[in-house]
Amino acid sequence: MQKLQISVYIYLFVLILAGPVDLNENSEQKENVEKEGLCNACTWRQNTKSSRIEAIKIQILSKLRLETAPNISKDAIRQLLPKAPPLRELIDQYDVQRDDSSDGSLEDDDYHATTETIITMPTESDLLMQVEGKPKCCFFKFSSKIQYNKVVKAQLWIYLRPVKTPTTVFVQILRLIKPMKDGTRYTGIRSLKLDMNPGAGIWQSIDVKTVLQNWLKQPESNLGIEIKALDENGHDLAVTFPRPGEDGLNPFLEVKVTDTPKRSRRDFGLDCDEHSTESRCCRYPLTVDFEAFGWDWIIAPKRYKANYCSGECEFVFLQKYPHTHLVHQANPRGSAGPCCTPTKMSPINMLYFNGKEQIIYGKIPAMVVDRCGCS
């Protein structure tokens, strides 16, 4: 009996000594597993972020119908960028992409960018026409996609050089036509009279919507325009061929077309930051910096919040297609698991140069991740 009691005491003593050691080992193992899990999650998110940035670059070029990024230097941009009110307003009042809950979903969005405003600079005409012994002022080419949208506004902007004394300026916009029997080579579009005072030069806009619509209907009639702005002494104040120091003062067209809004349903998802320990499918912040790419051809925005999705998708988290959960329960081996993916996206507005050195202000759909979910 005494031997049995001694054996029991020894056994209990061993358990007491061994117990804490096992608990500590289990705790350390659990902590190591958690750390390893967090490390793997960080690596996965970093890879997802890098892939998202590369995908964004490809999407932008594709949606703008560009095979490669336009090769426009900063010096060329300074010369081409008009120093004019409409462009300055677009840049100064630029609607930087906000993280809001505005409607717009991945399913309802068109793929290609919908143009809202196009700023077209003059180019050389294929037909080198002469007007009164001098080359014509301005010829504008229009992208074919404008023909499939309704033109709601078309303004010709011209810059008038400063004057030293108060004067009245007579502005004439003439449309070039094929030579007629009597020798006429142009017809009037608009005429206006304005008073100028000494000081800085001014920008003047002229409505040319009707002319533009006619050009779009009959492209062969687009031979260019002639601009005249004569003061009381007969001096032409219009900048048609910029002199040294007059970069950015070329005439240009500002064309606005309609953009059809779309309605969509609202989805909900988790929002996380980079330090989050959330393992489920979540939306994480990501800022895309175009200057870091060397994409100087994008005038604005220079950067925007794109966001990305990352995380696990267990079937209990499935949001978009609940019936998939039932299918998985019925046949777990034959069902592919859900993926963490954008369920709601919104567009960004962008001001950029295209391959023809035209300035475009357009909307690019599905560029910002608003919600993430499992599907």
Swiss-Prot record:
InterPro entries: Cystine-knot_cytokine (IPR029034), TGF-b_C (IPR001839), TGF-b_propeptide (IPR001111), TGF-beta-rel (IPR015615), TGFb_CS (IPR017948)
Site (Cleavage): 98-99
Proregion positions: 19-266
Subcellular location: Secreted
SS bonds (residue pairs): 272-282, 281-340, 309-372, 313-374
GO MF terms, alphabetically ordered: cytokine activity; growth factor activity; heparin binding; identical protein binding
Pfam families (UniProt xref): TGF_beta, TGFb_propeptide
Record's keyword annotation contains Protein transport: no
SMART domains the record matches: TGFB
Transmembrane spans: none
Post-translational modification: Synthesized as large precursor molecule that undergoes proteolytic cleavage to generate an N-terminal propeptide and a disulfide linked C-terminal dimer, which is the biologically active molecule. The circulating form consists of a latent complex of the C-terminal dimer and other proteins, including its propeptide, which maintain the C-terminal dimer in a latent, inactive state. Ligand activation requires additional cleavage of the prodomain by a tolloid-like metalloproteinase.
Keyword terms: Cleavage on pair of basic residues, Cytokine, Disulfide bond, Glycoprotein, Growth factor, Heparin-binding, Secreted, Signal
List of glycosylated residues: 71
Domain of life: Eukaryota
Summary of the function given for this chain in its UniProt record: Acts specifically as a negative regulator of skeletal muscle growth.
Assembly behavior: Homodimer; disulfide-linked. Interacts with WFIKKN2, leading to inhibit its activity. Interacts with FSTL3.
Protein family according to the UniProt entry: Belongs to the TGF-beta family.
Name of the protein in its database record: Growth/differentiation factor 8
Source organism of this protein record: Equus caballus (Horse)
Gene of this entry: MSTN
